[in-house]
């Protein structure tokens, strides 16, 4: 991703364009799946993922100026670099956006999330989110147990979740047991 201060909703490709393979995201601890967003209520693959990973809570949110109260403030908060002490799981049912994640060299990688894409960011990973220029995403948020909404804005390197992430992923070059599709 480039270092431009232009509109955060733009793709921000480096020149020349550089695309990151799913294997690289997997090495950073990121999981991803392509699912059927048009029939998510009956999707057996989604049910299996939720059961296997213990995602017992879910809700759906629309992020757009017309539907999200305090839209501008929330978009600004989403784009503030932060980590969470639990996984961040998002399933795009409609629309699109970008998750920006830090690699092992502390450089940004921009991950496009589109309809049908499910992404899991590991606890302790610094990241941020923005919509793209379409200004709309309908996302399913999943949690293990009761939802924890607390973002810890950078720097919070002292938190156990961050220390574990750095030790497991950054210092060891990735989690080879991670499955990304």
From Swiss-Prot:
Its main location: cytoplasm. CDD domains: cupin_ARD. Coiled coil: none annotated. Keywords: Cytoplasm, Nucleus. The keyword Cytoplasm applies. It comes from the Eukaryota. It is found in: Cytoplasm; Nucleus. The keyword ATP-binding does not apply. GO terms for molecular function: acireductone dioxygenase [iron(II)-requiring] activity. Pfam families: ARD (PF03079). GO terms for biological process: L-methionine salvage from methylthioadenosine; methionine metabolic process. Belongs to the acireductone dioxygenase (ARD) family. Probable inactive acireductone dioxygenase. This is Probable inactive acireductone dioxygenase 2. It comes from Sorghum bicolor.
């Amino acid at each position: 991703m480039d270092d431009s201060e232009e509109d955060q909703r733009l793709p921000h490709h480096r020149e020349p364009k550089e695309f990151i393979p799913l294997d690289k995201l997997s090495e950073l601890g990121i999981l991803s799946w392509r699912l059927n967003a048009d029939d998510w209520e009956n999707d057996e693959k989604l049910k299996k993922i939720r059961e296997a990973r213990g995602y017992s809570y879910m809700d759906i949110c629309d992020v757009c100026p017309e539907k999200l109260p305090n839209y501008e403030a929330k978009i600004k908060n989403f784009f503030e670099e932060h980590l969470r002490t639990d996984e961040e799981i998002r399933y795009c049912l409609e629309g699109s956006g970008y998750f920006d994640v830090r690699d092992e060299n502390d450089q940004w990688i921009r991950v496009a999330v589109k309809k049908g894409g499910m992404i899991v960011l590991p606890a302790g990973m610094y990241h941020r989110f923005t919509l793209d220029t379409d200004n709309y995403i309908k996302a399913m948020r999943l949690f293990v147990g009761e939802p924890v909404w607390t973002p810890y804005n950078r720097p919070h390197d002292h938190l156990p979740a961050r220390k574990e992430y750095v030790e497991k992923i950054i210092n060891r070059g990735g989690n080879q047991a991670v499955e990304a599709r």
